[in-house]
Amino acid sequence: MLSKQIPLGIYEKALPAGECWLERLQLAKTLGFDFVEMSVDETDERLSRLDWSREQRLALVNAIVETGVRVPSMCLSAHRRFPLGSEDDAVRAQGLEIMRKAIQFAQDVGIRVIQLAGYDVYYQEANNETRRRFRDGLKESVEMASRAQVTLAMEIMDYPLMNSISKALGYAHYLNNPWFQLYPDIGNLSAWDNDVQMELQAGIGHIVAVHVKDTKSGVFKNVPFGEGVVDFERCFETLKQSGYCGPYLIEMWSETAEDPAAEVAKARDWVKARMAKAGMVEAA
């Protein structure tokens, strides 16, 4: 029987680095998480996962079955390095090939949602042509995802092109495809001049998962929970009242910390306390 509890997950980069997924999922289970989100970033090490052998993919599936901890989503940030909006045709082609491989990987191992980074370009100057290429790249990507029955979900970013749910909804309407949805980050959403609660309400019906982190104006990573500007309790209340019942993912980058598990446990308790105040989970 499926649990009625709120699914709470942890980002791979919060846990100790390494390629043993059985150990990673066992630790996540010990820490009380329902799932882990995989990272495929712009490093060669994590990009190489998209070329895993059949045996390596099967090892991940077996680890999921053995531990009962799911890997339902992938954070695909590799497009920073190989952006879909690049004016260099070779770079853009690599970006589309990464997308194809990521969708195939997701299909093979049971990942349901690939979170996309909302950058037309990252290391170059954006213009109308990069945005056009980005839109066309998304269209091609969503066609691939549709055939594979894998959802592509746009993150609300630390970048003006995609820094609000309203802007991401524009792409959802343009693509008009059920396999393209939204994956807001309440930290990123709060760091800009957005009406956060109105934005969350506007996205209901399109939100497939929520990233949970704290931020400050202009600071989008490594802000300790409680030291930033995010009104977590209000965000959780708004999402609950609007009918959102999906997963929440604590996003952290503590893999190189002295004791990553302790950092994660502290963050988990802090977030769950705010969820309890919002009436989402029972108080500990």
UniProtKB/Swiss-Prot annotation:
Keywords: Isomerase. Its EC number is 5.1.3.22. Induction: Induced by L-ascorbate. Repressed by UlaR. Transmembrane segments: none annotated. It catalyses: L-ribulose 5-phosphate = L-xylulose 5-phosphate. One of its GO terms (biological process) is L-ascorbic acid catabolic process. Pathway: Cofactor degradation; L-ascorbate degradation; D-xylulose 5-phosphate from L-ascorbate: step 3/4. PANTHER family: ISOMERASE (PTHR43489), L-RIBULOSE-5-PHOSPHATE 3-EPIMERASE ULAE (PTHR43489:SF8). Catalyzes the isomerization of L-xylulose-5-phosphate to L-ribulose-5-phosphate. Is involved in the anaerobic L-ascorbate utilization. This is L-ribulose-5-phosphate 3-epimerase UlaE. It comes from Escherichia coli (strain ATCC 8739 / DSM 1576 / NBRC 3972 / NCIMB 8545 / WDCM 00012 / Crooks).
